[in-house]
Amino acid sequence: RDRWTAPNASNQWYSENGIIQITVDPRAGGHNGREGLDMIYRQLTVNEVQDFCAWAEWLQSLPYVRPEKIGVEGFSFGGTMTAMLLMKAPDKFHYGIAGGGVYDWAFYDTHYTERYMDTPQNNPDGYKISRALEYVEGYPATFICNCLHPASGADMPVEPVMLKITHGTGDDNVHHQNTLLFIDALQKAGKKFDFMIYPDGMHGYRGYQGDHFLNANRQFWLRYL
């Protein structure tokens, strides 16, 4: 169904900078009720990736959209999805900001995870295919060694794909162990990414950390979109 929220200052900022915003409801977003939940049972993120990709393909077909400049941003489960999309569909999602995400469901609390995923013992294959750490090799951003030195006066090239990851070390919902394991896997694979840590930050940044998060994210979008 069609739903929208009242305009706010953030929406206005995107509009003034020529960035189109859309919000996507995947099949388990709530509007499909029990049927939607059944679709994702024991395989979190799998069908959701397909749904987001369908939206990206539609966006890329529009004459006023630059098909190589599709970004995605999310926090918590949205952070998980952002990372998954840039690793599983970097041809459709080129830039992303993933905040406070779960990158291995074995490290999230049981009352949420097992409701949707069953236990790791009963569903090892489901945990594997839903684990962001499994798809690091699909993320294409690597280091370019022939860049010009900034002193040359030339602009540094803008990467065709870039993921930014953030997490608060005080997050008592999604423990930052998730992000530490994720960035370690990216480093082992020689991948290039942005990372911002918020000391003692909770599951959602507040005060000066919230201001920093907002401003840093805006700078990211201005650079890449």
Predicted regions and their residues:
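Serine-hydrolase catalytic core recognition
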Residues: 1-225
